[in-house]
Amino acid sequence: MKQKYSKKSKKWIYITTIIFILILDISSKRLIIKYIKTYDTKKIFSVLNFFHVHNHGAAFSFLSDQNGWQKWFLSTVSMLTILVMTRIITKLKKQETKKITAYSLIIAGATGNLIDRIFYGFVVDFIDIHINDWHFATFNIADCSIFIGIIILMRINYST
């Protein structure tokens, strides 16, 4: 039996996903700013720290060593991403909920990091996963949202 999806359910998935991720992302960053000084670390588990750092670049601190132009460039890229992905969602069929969710996750992550760039001039990163002395790049909830959205899209595109 086919499920029925209304236009409202498509919007509901889209809006709820974005709002949930934004609340989680913004709240977590505010707590980090409030309770952990920049470059300080709080051990959470043996493989997880909260390490408060300001990223002036993109993923893996790409472009962070530039003289400030990257803030505007990355903000523009984020805005274009948000607009293009929103347009894609409006063109998707109502029953394409996995794609709608994936694009919504990417939009939410891009929006969360864009908000940081606008208000702080950098992105607040704090999730530090490590094994002994090896540390993965520090990231945040918005980055996780973007990553998960991309993985979902890749699975959809490579499984069909």
From Swiss-Prot:
Annotated pathway: Protein modification; lipoprotein biosynthesis (signal peptide cleavage)
Keyword Cell inner membrane on entry: yes
Subcellular location: Cell inner membrane
InterPro entries, A to Z: Peptidase_A8
Annotated membrane topology: Multi-pass membrane protein
Keywords noted in UniProt: Aspartyl protease, Cell inner membrane, Cell membrane, Hydrolase, Membrane, Protease, Transmembrane, Transmembrane helix
Family matches, as PROSITE patterns: SPASE_II (PS00855)
BP GO annotations: proteolysis
One GO cellular component, as annotated: plasma membrane
Single GO term (MF): aspartic-type endopeptidase activity
Primary location class: membrane
Pfam families: Peptidase_A8 (PF01252)
Catalytic reactions on record: Release of signal peptides from bacterial membrane prolipoproteins. Hydrolyzes -Xaa-Yaa-Zaa-|-(S,diacylglyceryl)Cys-, in which Xaa is hydrophobic (preferably Leu), and Yaa (Ala or Ser) and Zaa (Gly or Ala) have small, neutral side chains
EC id: 3.4.23.36
List of catalytic residues: D125, D143
Membrane-spanning ranges: 13-33, 72-92, 104-124, 134-154
Function: This protein specifically catalyzes the removal of signal peptides from prolipoproteins.
Database matches in NCBIfam families: lspA
Family according to the record: Belongs to the peptidase A8 family.
The name this protein goes by in its record: Lipoprotein signal peptidase
Organism, as annotated: Buchnera aphidicola subsp. Acyrthosiphon pisum (strain 5A)
